[in-house]
Structures are given as structure tokens and as C-alpha cells.
């Protein structure tokens, strides 16, 4: 039975970043359900926007994005829509439009060969015994059993590691549903849509490489029905759909209290969305995935006496920032407050009157 210093479950942005940073310094094994190349197998449903905090992380690491990861076009504003109030506003944003699956595969490709990576693999069972973490996984057509001193859960919203460590922990979840359509809009755009009759979270759209992606986060019970209902409403705002080319769905976490951020215990650690590190106001998680990976790298290499305590303390600033996003989310999803903010015109950039496409409701007050 092979033994490692660190076993990482999941190679999204968090797991890939950590594996890359620990390579050559610790003996690392990493398991991921995505394939190494191509579009077959699992891909993460995501709007695919790289926030400024994530961009800063790449600056610190001296990394630049390859052209095949960057999507077309690059959009400089978010069109915010309040459906019930028939209001539309434009707010400046500095996101980079990316192909999320290509981005994930690129992140994996940066992991040095010294890390033992198993692609298209499935983690079957984990447990702790004799001060070691035991992992049984299936890869290359057969089951393998390894042990590790430290276990890292970077396995997202449905984290197996989080469920093992905190079997009674409950965090609010939504089903994220996305559909892809051939782009019909004369001018591409990115939008954020609020409609409390549909969801107490939010919906979105993004133009990407000739496609129009429309999605949102909805209650688990009847998400598909609500998604369809919102699509019908958006015709009043000049959204154009047609026949869906592709449909995607996944679970997304929605932290709503301080206790929703869990860091791990017993030499097991959680990073990225597995730890609840995702913005409640935008559902953006890549920047927090990268930040938590860097924090854990620093803790593991310093090897303090109590690693879990050290990691919890080191993530306090990150958790406080995310708690602020919970407060912001409550403001954005409160109909009266949101309507007042949007009507105030604060930070709104109006489009020129002779602009050919405005994507507003006929009753919208600009």
C-alpha cells in the first residue's frame, strides 16, 4: 500500500493550485473525475468569468492565461435586471470571459510530474485509522488503496470529504441550471437577473464564443420549472433564446451564516467550495478557491504544531470577507432595497439614446 504526505480529492481550481504549489516539497497524490484532455466526461457548469481577485492570484503566481482559455467577447459591464420592478441598470465590471472547462484542464496541466495524478477517477471511500487517512479510489479500470498523512477535500459542493468530516452539517444548496443557445443578440452582453418570485438567489446570462448562455440558481425541489418560467419572462427584456444546444445542471452551495464555512479537522482540510468558500452575492468561487489553496500551502509547508487550528486562523480574513458577501446578498435579494438602489442610479452607466440595442423591458425606467 503506497503512502503519501498529502492526498488531494478533486482538481478544480483549488485542488490544482494546491497540487502545483506542493509539488517537489511534499509527496502528493491527486484524484480528479475530469478527463485529462478533451470535452468527454465531467465538466463544471459555470458562467465562466474570472473575477479581479482571481486575476490578482495569477499575478502573484506569475501566470498568464493561454489564448485557448479566453472566450470571445470580453465584456466590461453587467446588465442588472430587476424583473418585478422592470428595471435595468449597467454596472462596470472587470471580469475576464473564459471557457471554464478549458480553464480547468489548463490548471491541471500546470501540475508538475512529481505529483501522482489520476484523471477520470472516482473516490470510493475514505476513513482515518492509525493516524493516517485511507483512500480507496477507482482509476484505470481497477480499485486502488493508498494512505496519506494529510487529506484535502477540494471536491466542490457535494464534497465527500466534507460529508465525512461533518455528517450533520447542513448548508443551503441550490440547483444551478444552464442552457446554451446559438447567439442571436446583435450586441453580446452579460447580465445578472433578480426575480424573487422565481428564486431568492439570482440568475445570469453571458455571451461566449457564438453562444448565449442562460442560467441561474434555483430551489432544489422544482428548479427546472422555475428556470423555464423565468425564460418566458425574459422575452419582455428582449432576451432571445431559440432551441437549446446544450443543458447543464449541478449543485451549488449558498452560505448564509458564519457556521457554513468549515475548514476541516483531524489532519483533513477543506478548500474552495468544499469549505463553503463561495460568494453568496455572486456565486463566484474561483478566487476563493485559489486563495484558500495558497493559505493551506503555507500552513502545510510551515508544519505548525496544530495544523487544523493554524489553517482555521489563517482563513479568518477570507471567511470574514465571505461573510460580508452574505450581508451583501441579503441586500441584493431584498426587493424594496434592491429597487431603491437601482432607481437611485448610483454607479449606473447609462447607454447612449441612439444605441441600437438596449435589452430593457418596455416599462423599464432608465
UniProtKB/Swiss-Prot annotation:
Protein name in UniProt: Protein CbrA
Family matches, as Gene3D superfamilies: FAD/NAD(P)-binding domain
Family: Belongs to the CbrA family.
UniProt xrefs under NCBIfam families: PRK11445.1 (NF008519)
Gene: cbrA
Alphabetical list of Pfam families matching this protein: FAD_binding_3
SUPFAM superfamilies referenced in this protein's UniProt entry, alphabetically: FAD/NAD(P)-binding domain
InterPro entries: FAD-bd (IPR002938), FAD/NAD-bd_sf (IPR036188), Geranylgeranyl_reductase (IPR050407)
GO MF, one annotated term: FAD binding
